[in-house]
């Protein structure tokens, strides 16, 4: 019986083993079929990857094949993009043909000095991995759109652009002397009334409106001091004169910010705040809280006080509060009658109609409410009334009508229509064939024609730059509008100081421009130091040269306004996600408006980027701090040099660099330097 059982068990076991082997064979067969279907795609990917040898490989002189996988592959295969230099070997100077020397301009190609491959490296990473980071996807899209945009530039006839027309608006606008809008029309226009040609001295704007009743708002800062969870009653509104045409796609500068706060101010009193703002950087506020300002001649504005007096309650005091009624009667009885001072309450009240008149005077703005002068705000350097091309009214107020009269009837002097001045006086010298002291890369947006022109007319006229002891170049990407790109190309060909990067410009990709500056400073010129700055940064070139001359040439240098242990903002407008920056703090980094690195650091950055080992982050100044930290740890010690005179927020005394300077402020700062007075034109 045991033998029979044993035979029976063995039969069952062999049957199960037979079924398992069949199952494994089926899986193997399915896998072979899968490979057969995927093998052609695999061969195609291998061919694409093997077609690029990186930055150190030899490429042709005139073309660069850009290949992308996935759904974008068919769109970009076999795309030829021009590159004017040899891709292999070091290049130190620009070669200029005799014809170009005679004509004074050169034909601009889309990939100057191999910069297409900077963003191209980001693209090639897509061929090496299925998953792309948000940054890589963004760069991917910008590269493709930029390549197409550059092709469209060749089809666009720049000569057909009317110099009197705005390349931002696409049409010539009339300059009416008066404009009126009712409340409904204003709401349909997002509460903005256009003033096509700005204001002039004597222009006035009358606003008829009613402040809304206070509502509760959360103020987290107050929750620590009170038990109301930070909830306060707020009733306020803003009247702003904005420069709508001074920056396309940017926050317009606020030439005047008028903010009546009926309830909700931090001092629990009604106030009227006046200020200016340029590129989201506010100036010093002028606050009127009912205390009259001085009558000294140096603080008056066209003879008016900056702040008038009003009472702190709703009762109108017809007699000075320091005097009692008895004292006043006694003085009149003995013949020493004193004329009582008339005071008024705060000019705005919830639910009550007001008539506000804003008038542009000779030295400043004057605000009248109900026919009474309330405050005056002096014009600030760099902000001109002719640039005030829009009136915005926001906040807790119902507007019934707005009337603007005596407006400017001609286009502003610094408008984009007149931004570029094609004069040989402002042309850049050619790149020198010998080493020089400092290379300066200036980041600029495509449509910043006024900013670039202001830089050419000011600190780029420094003798060190004119003699090529210092070399400066703009680094500019492309714009969605083909007429803007066409004008950029014309500007670059004429002045010879622009390096065009063929990807679509956006803030998150500024770091690619920084890498381009490093590559240019290493492979196309010979300078021991490289400086990065912005087109709204005014540079005192002689001060910068003195600073780098004080550093030993053997040392690696990182100089600027350094930040230590700064943390990413995880909430709000400038949020940095944990995916973008997983660390809790940033490395030490210099503020982006102006910093200096030695050339060996730039070489390290270019080398790491060519080997795909460079970490890219959307904040270019933080990225530079990270790269310098890695260089300091792996290569050789770096001398970190800090100075507050690399001013991040505006201008400071004895500055090296001044940030957030408008074109008018640039001219003012340059005039001061020529007079031997390095003074700020607008303290912030």
Curated annotation (Swiss-Prot):
Pathway: Protein modification; protein glycosylation. Optimum pH is 6.5. The chain crosses the membrane at residues 23-43. It is a single-pass type II membrane protein. Its cofactor is Mn(2+). Induction: By salt stress. Residues 191-405 form the Galectin domain. Its EC number is 2.4.1.-. Disruption phenotype: Reduced levels of arabinogalactan proteins. Defects in root hair growth, root elongation, pollen tube growth, flowering time, leaf development, silique length and inflorescence growth. Increased sensitivity to salt stress. Glycans are attached at residues 103, 127, 162, 524, 632. It is found in: Golgi apparatus membrane. InterPro entries: ConA-like_dom_sf, Galectin_CRD, Glyco_trans_31. Gene3D superfamilies: 2.60.120.200, 3.90.550.50. PROSITE patterns: GALECTIN (PS51304). Pfam families: Gal-bind_lectin (PF00337), Galactosyl_T (PF01762). Residues 44-684 are lumenal. GO terms for cellular component: endoplasmic reticulum; Golgi apparatus; Golgi membrane. The keyword Iron does not apply. Its main location: Golgi. Residues 1-22 are cytoplasmic. PANTHER family: BETA-1,3-N-ACETYLGLUCOSAMINYLTRANSFERASE (PTHR11214), HYDROXYPROLINE O-GALACTOSYLTRANSFERASE GALT2 (PTHR11214:SF212). This is Hydroxyproline O-galactosyltransferase GALT2. The gene is GALT2.
């Amino acid at each position: 019986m045991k033998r029979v059982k044993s035979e029976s068990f063995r039969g069952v076991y062999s049957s199960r083993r037979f079924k398992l082997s069949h199952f494994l064979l089926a899986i193997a067969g399915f896998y072979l079929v899968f490979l057969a279907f995927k093998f052609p795609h695999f061969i195609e990917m291998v061919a694409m990857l093997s077609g690029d040898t990186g930055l150190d490989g030899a490429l042709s002189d005139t073309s660069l094949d850009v290949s992308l996988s996935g759904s974008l592959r068919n769109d970009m295969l076999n795309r030829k993009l021009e590159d004017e230099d040899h891709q292999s070997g070091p290049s130190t100077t620009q070669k200029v043909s005799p014809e170009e020397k005679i004509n004074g301009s050169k034909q601009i190609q889309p990939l100057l000095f191999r910069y297409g491959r900077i963003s191209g490296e980001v693209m090639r990473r897509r061929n090496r991995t299925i998953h792309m980071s948000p940054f890589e996807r963004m760069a991917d899209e910008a590269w493709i759109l930029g390549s197409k945009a550059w092709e469209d530039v060749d089809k666009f006839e720049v000569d057909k652009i009317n110099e009197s027309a705005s390349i931002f608006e696409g049409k010539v606008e009339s300059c009416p002397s008066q404009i009126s809008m009712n409340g409904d029309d204003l709401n349909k226009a997002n509460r903005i009334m256009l003033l096509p040609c700005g204001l002039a001295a004597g222009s006035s704007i009358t606003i008829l409106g009613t402040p809304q009743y206070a509502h509760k708002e959360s103020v987290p800062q107050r929750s620590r001091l009170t038990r109301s969870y930070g909830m306060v009653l707020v009733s306020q509104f803003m009247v702003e004169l904005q420069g709508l045409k001074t920056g396309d796609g940017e926050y317009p500068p606020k030439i005047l910010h008028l903010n009546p706060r009926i309830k909700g101010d931090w001092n629990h009193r009604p106030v009227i705040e006046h200020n200016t703002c340029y590129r989201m950087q506010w100036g010093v506020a002028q606050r009127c809280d009912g205390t009259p300002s001085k009558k000294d001649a140096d603080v008056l504005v066209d003879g008016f006080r900056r702040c008038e007096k009003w009472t702190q309650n709703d009762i109108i005091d017809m007699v000075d509060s320091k005097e009692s009624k008895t004292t006043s009667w006694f003085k009149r009885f003995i013949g020493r009658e004193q004329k009582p001072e008339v005071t008024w309450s705060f000019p705005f009240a919830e639910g009550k109609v007001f008539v506000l008149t804003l008038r542009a005077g000779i030295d400043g703005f004057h605000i009248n409410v109900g026919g009474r002068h309330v405050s005056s705000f002096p014009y600030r350097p760099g902000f001109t009334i002719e640039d005030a091309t829009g009136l915005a009214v926001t906040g807790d107020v119902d507007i019934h009508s707005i009337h603007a009269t005596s407006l400017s009837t001609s286009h502003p002097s610094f408008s984009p229509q007149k931004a570029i001045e094609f004069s040989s006086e402002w042309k850049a010298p050619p790149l020198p064939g010998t080493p020089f002291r400092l290379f300066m890369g200036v980041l600029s947006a495509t449509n910043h024609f006024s900013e670039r022109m202001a830089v050419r007319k000011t600190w780029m006229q420094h003798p060190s730059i004119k003699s090529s002891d210092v070399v400066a170049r703009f680094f500019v990407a492309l714009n969605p509008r083909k007429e803007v790109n066409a004008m950029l190309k014309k500007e670059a060909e004429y002045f010879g100081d622009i390096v065009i990067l063929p990807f679509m410009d956006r803030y998150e990709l500024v770091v690619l421009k920084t890498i381009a500056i490093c590559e240019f400073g290493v492979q196309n010129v010979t300078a021991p130091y490289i400086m990065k700055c912005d087109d709204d940064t005014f540079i005192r070139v002689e001060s910068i040269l003195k600073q780098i001359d004080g550093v030993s040439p053997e040392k690696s240098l990182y100089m600027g306004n350094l930040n230590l242990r700064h943390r990413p903002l995880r909430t709000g407008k400038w949020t940095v996600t944990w995916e973008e920056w997983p660390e809790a703090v940033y490395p030490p980094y210099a503020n982006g408006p102006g910093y200096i690195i030695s050339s060996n650091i730039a070489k390290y950055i270019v080398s790491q980027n060519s080997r795909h080992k460079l970490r890219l982050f959307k904040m270019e100044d933080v990225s530079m701090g990270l790269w310098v930290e890695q260089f300091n740890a792996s290569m050789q010690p770096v001398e970190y040099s800090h100075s507050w005179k690399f001013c991040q927020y505006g201008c400071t005394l004895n500055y090296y660099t001044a940030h957030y300077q408008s074109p008018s402020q640039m001219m003012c700062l340059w005039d001061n330097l020529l007079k031997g007075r390095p003074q700020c034109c607008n303290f912030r």
